[in-house]
Each structure stands twice: as C-alpha cells, then as structure tokens.
C-alpha cells in the first residue's frame, strides 16, 4: 500500500474530526434536531452557547456529513439518529466521554510511552494506580466505560450467537460482561442454558441494576470474582467466556489469568477468549495495531497479540485442544478445554 503526503496530512489532522463530533455529543446537540429542523440562532439558544461558535460547530458537522441544511435550517437525517441522539440505545456519547476523560489525554503522551515502554497514567492523572482502579473510582466513568463496550460488542455478539451452538452447554459464565449484552443475547436464543456473569465487586451493583432494568434480573445471576487473584466462582459452569480482556494485560499476566481460569474450571469445561488479534505476520489490521498503542499508554504492559501467541499461552496454562475459531463479526475466538483434574489444586 502506497500513501500520499495528503493521506499523511489527513491522518495527522484526524483529531479535528474526533473532537468536533465528541463536542457535539457532549453538548447533546443532535437531541435538539431529533424532532424538528432548526436554524443556527435557535440551536445556539438551545445549546446556551454564543451564536458565532455554535454556527461554526454546525457548519463543521454539516461538512462532515452528520447534518444536512436546507433553507437555513439544519436537519438530522433519520439514519443518524440511532447513534447520535442521547436516548437511543446505540448512542455514542458514552464513548465520547470516555475518550475525552481518559484516552485523549493519555494519547497526548504517546511519544513518552514509546520512549520508555510504559503507561502514562502518572503523567496524565497524577496517579500510579492500575488503569481499572482509576477508572472505577468514579461511578459515572464506570457507566461510560461499560455502556460503550456494550455498544462495541454488538457486531461480535451477533456473530457469536449466529455461529456458535450454546445448546451443547448446560451453564454459561461470562467474565467481565460489560452491560451483560452477551448473556442477554444467549438468554433470548437459548432458554435451557443457565446464565451468570462474573464481575469485579466495583461494578457488580451497576450490572445488577442494569439487568433488572432490562428484565433479566432473575434470569442472569451476577457473581463477584477476580481473574488476577484467582477468586473465581466458576463452579460447574461448563462454558466460560472472557471477552476482549486479555489484551488489557501483559503476556505474563495473561498467563496468570488463563491458569486461574483453568484451575477453577470443571473437568470437561470449555473456555473461550474473544479478541481482535493481530495478523499472523503482525502486519495489522490497523485497528488492532492502534489499539495496542492504546494499551501501551494506559495499561501495565497490555498488548495485542497474534493468534499463535494466544494459543501458546493457552497451552502453557494447561488447556487441551487449544484452537482458533473464526466467527462472523470483528472478533476471533481462542478456544480450549480442560480434560484432566488439577494436580494438587483446589476447585472453586
């Protein structure tokens, strides 16, 4: 692939577009155009912002394609409302707030992260605690994080439900489930599978409330556990899933997590990790490669890996029949089974 100088300029200036859209979402600008078209003066009054700067923002959003304009009135196309209006299920404002609060400041220190091969939490937040300890100290930040992950997971969940037969299992435990989107989808498609979610204590209350709001409070149980410490309430669950989480940790910590899950699993159980791995030759894809840099600036050694690297860790942790399973959608499944009892280890 050959890129031009203009391609480079466009990529270097890409944050202009990002900040424009995030600002509009933060102001809930699109909410005011859901039911009727409005002119710049009306929008400025509703946003409680000066007319000149409001019009500058509206012009930019029109130029980017999010708004249309006719006879001086700005219009929000119907097909954009699902992800731009704040009370819609797929609203992207959760992601926008997370980017503004955490990711954008951290990425401002990418050069230092590369030079020193370490996260930039101390520089940005004045706090050397873990990424998740910083994130979970504010309930609003937890909500933003879990909500946008739930939105991100939708295409993966559709593919997982379509291509994997959950009916072969009696009980399914989803570790780190966000807003519970995957277990909810399994509940809707497989009435005979017992369902539970394992979450950190800091997020379990949020998740229980979310499940009750959606009508799944009785159908899906919420358990508390920790993959790092090994305090995992896996019990007799014969299918365990860890979604888009291994990459948050350094390879040596990933191995600890995998061993803890393996030790807690019942014999005959199956474990699946879903990730967006690098290509086998580590040439991309672009999103995963950039996500790996996001792990660099924010986490303690988190990194994206190739399928073979994930499989190697599965084998080291003790899993049998470790393999890659391709499904529809953006993620890949890394699958392994437990076929023998632990040597001297105790079950949860």
Swiss-Prot record:
Residues at the active site: 247 (proton acceptor)
Lineage: superkingdom: Bacteria
Pfam families: Dimerisation (PF08100), Methyltransf_2 (PF00891)
SUPFAM superfamilies for the chain: S-adenosyl-L-methionine-dependent methyltransferases, Winged helix' DNA-binding domain
EC numbers, comma separated: 2.1.1.-
Function comment: Involved in the biosynthesis of 4-methoxy-2,2'-bipyrrole-5-carbaldehyde (MBC), one of the terminal products involved in the biosynthesis of the red antibiotic prodigiosin (Pig). Catalyzes the transfer of a methyl group from S-adenosyl-L-methionine (SAM) to the hydroxyl group of 4-hydroxy-2,2'-bipyrrole-5-carbaldehyde (HBC) to yield 4-methoxy-2,2'-bipyrrole-5-carbaldehyde (MBC).
A GO molecular-function descriptor: protein dimerization activity
Taxonomic source organism: Serratia sp. (strain ATCC 39006) (Prodigiosinella confusarubida)
Gene: pigF
Disruption phenotype: Cells lacking this gene show an orange phenotype and produce norprodigiosin.
Pathway: Antibiotic biosynthesis; prodigiosin biosynthesis
GO biological-process terms attached to the record: antibiotic biosynthetic process; methylation
Gene3D superfamilies: Vaccinia Virus protein VP39 (3.40.50.150), Winged helix-like DNA-binding domain superfamily/Winged helix DNA-binding domain (1.10.10.10)
UniProt protein name: S-adenosyl-L-methionine-dependent methyl transferase PigF
